[in-house]
Amino acid sequence: MILAVGVAILITLSGCGQYVPGTYTEEKSFEDIMSGPDINVSLSGDQNSGSTPKALEDLQIHHIDVGDGSSTLVIAPNGETMLIDSGPREANGSEVISYLEEVNVSRIDHLVATNPDPSHIGGHAAVIHHFETNHDGIGQAYGSGVSTSSETYTEYTSALREHDLARYNVASGYQLPFGAETRVAVINPPRTGTDSNGPETNSVALSIHYDDFTYLITSDAGRQAERRMANQYPDQINADVYQVGNHGESTSSTDLFFEMVAPSATIISSGQNGEHGSPSREVMQRLESTGVETYWTATHGDTVIISNGTDFQVRTQMNHTTDAGEIGSISIGATEMVVPAGQVDTRRPHTELGL
């Protein structure tokens, strides 16, 4: 796999630190990417530009570019793996399986379905069949307990039964077992019973902690769920990196919630032609107003967060601005990628990426 790397940039999270615009280097191999410097953020306030996370010694969070959907691979420092969602039904898990093969994942210890929408579990059945047949299988599966009658959901549950896999319904207050060093807290759906507003409100939301580093993923949880999480888990939602809710749609990342999350970097997972116009101008303006670094899989491609618990780095498949205002100015309806003036589109299709 070829990923694009930037120079090392160090900031503090003390409230006064800011990113300094950096220049970009030549494209590098996957091995170079995973061992070399990139955007380096200190969580402790101690500037240590020599601190470079290494594969399987740190927490890795891979945002796989699946188009109009979401799929996130988390690798714990001990090598344990968690796949959160698998992208849209149209792709049938092909991009996810290809990516997992490229990064040498032979077993998925934890498979999470944040909600039964096809943009999140579209590849679950294919991923289960592939790893149960060709590799070391799937450990355990987790979901919100909300079901649908869709063909995609039926295929997913059929695959679970076919391969005799256990599935656990989780709720706020639960913790998922994920290595000795990493804590994965479930903060949605409510433990008192699923909300009547449907699958999105009941999306599984996870707060992932590794020492001083916190990552927040809320799937499609909307305003009502965000209010509840803000009231019940104010410390859990405060995060260094936030995967923007509902692919950047205006139904999520509300003002108060985003203010309490207070991230240093945000990731938006959606396609260039988002089904519901994601990311929305409202959300992009909110991100722009805070100056937070923003990464969009439609413009940055596969995006990897690496943290040693003190610092975190952001590595992207493609060089692109991280200014939310500039990203928000891209035409959502464009049929081809719009590249800002002075930048070159170096994206490569998955079929041309190799280790």
What are these regions (language model features)?
Residues 13-355:
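Non-globular, low-confidence helical/coil segments that flank catalytic cores
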Residues 1-14:
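Sec-dependent bacterial lipoprotein signal peptides
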